[in-house]
Amino acid sequence: FRQFSLFKNGGFNLESFEQAIRDEAKSGSVRVILNFPQNPSGYSPTKDEAEKICQILKDVASSGVKILAISDDAYFGLNYEDNIEPESLFARTCDLHPNILAVKIDGPTKEDFVWGFRSGFLTFGNSTLTSEQYTALITKLMGIIRSSVSCSSTPPQSLLLRAIKDPATNIQKNEYRNILEERYKIVRNFCNTHKCSCLEPLPFNSGYFMSFNVIGKDSEQLRKKLLNEYGIGVVSIDSKTLRVAFSSIEKEKLETVYEAIFKAAEEL
């Protein structure tokens, strides 16, 4: 399992990504997970970054390396800036190169605002695969599902199918999306206008969350302080990363919550 440095100069670290891909390619194959909007940072690549990510994958595949490109799209579509790539990287990687097998993992939990449904789907894409090869992949996948989760919950799937057919669904989704975007903009403005010596916001432009790089303090200690003294719940990803779900905070309370986070960090 290989990680790479995600950010550089406020954007996606293409150099670190390419180095990690090329290092792993020495074995003859690469498995890469493309998780956008990225959790926990809440970052999605710009149009230019998405183009370059795909070019890196294509260049490596052209050298004879087999690539499994997995697009984790659980938060896809919740973009709040105009320069974000609007299309899933799955669509780009499907016919990018014969040596690339694209996989899309997606679900309605966040995109369709159905928290707790815990259902999703997985599909494949490659321009050179035959119907027989697709059938073989699907059969393998069905076997994995039967031997692990057995079967997905039927009620959520039935409800979602009915919702998809209802013309009111998209109207409601747009209303909720606008609420999230409004909350995002408040947080974006706060982070642009307020500074804390021990909290550095990681780049964010989409999704449900944003995170801070905790400088010189322990994020778990900060999490406990916020919960015990301020009644604010956040998640410490590791000792240096604190995730905040701005999506669940009413807009009138956002500035108060973030002021408390900054204050608690300084007090540690």
Question: PLM ranges: what are they?
Answer:
Residues 2-5, 105, 235:
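Hydrophobic residues at beta-strand termini and immediately following loops
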Residues 6-84:
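Active-site phosphate-binding strand-loop segment of PLP-dependent enzymes
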Residues 20-29, 55-66, 91-98, 127-133, ...:
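Alpha-helix termini
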Residues 22, 54, 98, 221-268:
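PLP-dependent enzyme catalytic core of the Aspartate aminotransferase-like
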Residues 94-178:
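Conserved core segment of the aminotransferase class I/II
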Residues 123, 211-213, 245-247:
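Short hydrophobic/aromatic beta-strand micro-patches
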Residues 161, 173-188, 198-213, 238-241:
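Conserved glycine-rich beta-strand-loop-beta hairpin in the small C-terminal domain of fold type I
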